[in-house]
Amino acid sequence: MPIITLPDGTQKIFEQVVSVTQVAKSIGLSLAKAALAGEVDGQLVDTSFLIKTDANLAIITANDDKGLEIIRHSTAHLLAQATQMLYPKAQVTIGPVIDNGFYYDFVYKDGFSESDLAKIEKNMHKLVKQNLKIERFEMSRNEAIQFFKDKGEYYKTEIIESIPAGQTLSLYKQGNFIDLCRGPHVPLTAKLKAFKLMKLAGAYWRGDSNNEMLQRVYGTAWATKQDLEEHLHRLEEASRRDHRKIGKIQDLFHIQEEAPGMIFWHAKGWTLCQLIEQYMRGIFKDNDYQEVHTPQLIDKSLWEKSGHWEKFGDTMFTTSSENRDYAVKPMNCPAHIQIYNQGLKSYRDLPLRLAEFGSCHRNEPSGTLHGIMRVRNFVQDDGHIFCTPEQIQVEVSTFIDLTFAVYKHFGFDKVDIKLSTRPENHVGSDEVWDKAEAALAEALDAKVIKWEFQKGEGAFYGPKIEFVLKDCLERQWQCGTLQVDFSMPERLDAQFIDENNIKQTPVVLHRAILGSLERFVGILIEHYEGAYPCWLTPIQAVVINISGKQADFVIDITKKLKKQGLRVISDLRNEKIGFKIREHSLQRYPYILIVGDREMEKDQISVRQRGGKDLGVMSIEAFVEKINQEIL
């Protein structure tokens, strides 16, 4: 006689073993119809799952995040079924859920084309209309191996062979299609109505470049067709804002094969970077940071001592000289500790704040590189605060306020905060980690702001606070971090003399606000769609003439505006004024200054604001005052 406790505390008593579906029906037919799965004592199960003893139960529907994940996973299996119906020689491998969708990897020697995607998607919709029942059943490991061998599914067989002997495995059947899966799945294919196949890509079997290349099919799936349409609209908008497209139009940067993952900054793009750095330098100065600069190449022995070699050796660029091994720095922290170690410090010297626009290199896999968002060479607004344990909370609190202020200045008002705790492979004792995690949690609680845990996502040397921006499309970008580190300063012999004249090890707070400068520029490009705030835009105004008669006047105006500290260019080409205006409007310059005979006679300019608004005629002095007020 199981007693089922629902999320609101309501209890239902049943005379015998009961399924999740039956419990849902006892609550209401509409809930039973909407049910996709159940959560029994914290474990997700199918709606057919039988509850034999007292249990806590939540009915999972498409309105839940967990329900959406089940929809996406079930749609991945629907994709596999539809594909094998059309292409029987295609072998299935894996099909996990990812952000906003799913993918499935196939082994298919003939390869899929874009036209194949349309056929597969059409077949998926046919299977949805058939409303196939999705059923779970079990096999022993040996039975499953033989079953998939007989089907010619050698990759699936390899997966099962890697599972420890003696285990019972779950499989799912829909129509004639059977696949290995832990589940749960939706009960019927008719529950899967809002999906779209997005693209094809290559992927190595088990992520190893020595293995065979697979065909990866990406898709997206949602609870409703409206949700799907909204997502596709967001993707269209994101494509329009793609920093790679805008970067080319605005002549900001380029990337080429000879330097994969490394940026060739053009003049305007580099100006944008420098403006960001100048602003952040002011932030450093106002908050008592000492800006430093450290070497790019450092002996391997330091990276071994710091722990980076063990954790990141595979992603570090290395070289040798005079029988010594060096690594190009992937991060700046060990180098900053070397600066700290020059001269014994007193407790009166703490907190000591060091900052650097440090150029770092990481050998990211070529397949993960993406414009300036994911690169191999990047600059960080890196900083390290050396302090005592008693100073942690104040320093963390100050940094949180500072970070929010910087983001607001760049136009980001929506920021989520996450506290990432110790990963499995971490250095330092659990006692030290307990202390570090508690220090960050206390600092966050003291700020009375919303935050959430991310278990196991901390750095190998300490827990961290992550600052996640939301852009105009509600996309999330993790930028800022603050990490408490009790381990590395001890490993690298950092010390200070306390008030009792005893040597102690300082705590190091690793902190960055923007993170990768390259990535932050990419975020800004897409957030503003190239129409940056006036203080940040590489070119604030372009001066154009209507005819050749005004050429000297345009040159004179441009010089005057530059002397006032404005970033201005001129366009004296013998082109029609309409052509010039259209061309410079595409560059998203804040102002186009037009000069004709009337303006030249009165020593004035006609001002056109970004977006096409005509501000009329004004003096050069009035324009300078206007733009300065806007910047302030």
Curated annotation (Swiss-Prot):
GO terms for biological process: threonyl-tRNA aminoacylation. It catalyses: tRNA(Thr) + L-threonine + ATP = L-threonyl-tRNA(Thr) + AMP + diphosphate + H(+). Coiled coil: none annotated. InterPro entries: aa-tRNA-synt_IIb, aa-tRNA-synth_II, aa-tRNA-synth_II/BPL/LPL, Anticodon-bd, Anticodon-bd_dom_sf, Beta-grasp_dom_sf, TGS, TGS-like. Gene3D superfamilies: 3.10.20.30, 3.30.54.20, Anticodon-binding domain (3.40.50.800), Bira Bifunctional Protein, Domain 2 (3.30.930.10), Threonyl-trna Synthetase, Chain A, domain 2 (3.30.980.10). Its EC number is 6.1.1.3. Zn(2+) binds at residues 333, 384, 510. SMART domains: tRNA_SAD. Keywords: Aminoacyl-tRNA synthetase, ATP-binding, Cytoplasm, Ligase, Metal-binding, Nucleotide-binding, Protein biosynthesis, RNA-binding, tRNA-binding, Zinc. Pfam families: HGTP_anticodon, TGS, tRNA-synt_2b, tRNA_SAD. GO terms for cellular component: cytoplasm. Residues 1-61 form the TGS domain. It comes from the Bacteria. Residues 242-533 are annotated as: Catalytic. One of its GO terms (molecular function) is tRNA binding. It is found in: Cytoplasm. Binds 1 zinc ion per subunit. PROSITE patterns: AA_TRNA_LIGASE_II, TGS. Catalyzes the attachment of threonine to tRNA(Thr) in a two-step reaction: L-threonine is first activated by ATP to form Thr-AMP and then transferred to the acceptor end of tRNA(Thr). Also edits incorrectly charged L-seryl-tRNA(Thr). Homodimer. PANTHER family: THREONINE--TRNA LIGASE, CHLOROPLASTIC_MITOCHONDRIAL 2 (PTHR11451:SF44), THREONINE-TRNA LIGASE (PTHR11451). NCBIfam families: thrS. Belongs to the class-II aminoacyl-tRNA synthetase family. This is Threonine--tRNA ligase. It comes from Ruthia magnifica subsp. Calyptogena magnifica.
